[in-house]
């Protein structure tokens, strides 16, 4: 079920607004943006939209109860994983937790956040000393962040360095539990 296909940025500095596609858009497909926090459970997203007099009929909001419950469960798991990844004292964090996080974001079609989540996964792989996966996810992060924010966006330089030479990145091996 597709969600937002594009992201909007507002730049106060020069009073500009831009909307960019965060994934490939098929010919004839509408550009979509989200008006509420996409990480909220479905009922909360719909309630917030109703507060604005809007009844969303996108495929994601119109899905059946079972699909909605599965989606909400994935969102809860995302929140759990992000909390674990943020806790450097949590020894249950494995290298694969970052990949699991990416898979959940992809399953939820949260394309507007993929730059962020690929970056997180790449850093987690590097922190745990996984060379190939750190490089792979850093390259994904570069592509997603660059697509959304441009070639000079934050984290691009660090992700390029991580993609090219994981073992010399500042995060390398800092979360190993030898």
Regions picked out by a protein language model, each given a short descriptive name:
Residues 147-151, 155-166:
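Long amphipathic alpha-helical scaffold regions
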Residues 1-128, 133-136, 143-144, 157-161:
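C-terminal SET catalytic tail plus cysteine-rich post-SET Zn-binding segment of SAM-dependent SET-domain
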Residues 138-141, 152:
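Membrane-proximal bilayer-interacting regions
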Residues 160-178:
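Alpha-helical linker/edge segments of TPR/alpha-solenoid repeat scaffolds
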């Amino acid at each position: 079920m597709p969600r937002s296909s594009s992201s909007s940025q507002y730049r106060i500095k020069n009073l500009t607004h831009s909307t960019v596609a965060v994934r490939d858009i098929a010919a004839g497909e509408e550009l979509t943006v989200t008006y509420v926090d996409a990480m909220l459970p479905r009922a909360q997203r719909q309630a917030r939209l109703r507060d604005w007099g809007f009844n969303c009929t996108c495929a994601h909001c119109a899905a059946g109860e079972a699909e909605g419950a599965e989606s909400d469960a994935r969102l809860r798991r995302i929140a759990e994983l992000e909390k674990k990844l943020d806790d450097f004292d949590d020894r249950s964090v494995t290298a694969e937790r970052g990949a699991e996080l990416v898979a959940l974001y992809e399953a939820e079609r949260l394309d507007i956040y993929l730059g962020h989540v690929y970056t997180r996964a790449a850093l987690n792989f590097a922190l745990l000393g996984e060379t190939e996966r750190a490089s792979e996810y850093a390259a994904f992060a570069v592509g997603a962040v660059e697509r959304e924010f441009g070639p000079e966006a934050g984290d691009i330089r660090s992700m390029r360095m991580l993609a090219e030479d994981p073992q010399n990145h500042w995060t390398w091996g800092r979360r190993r539990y030898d």
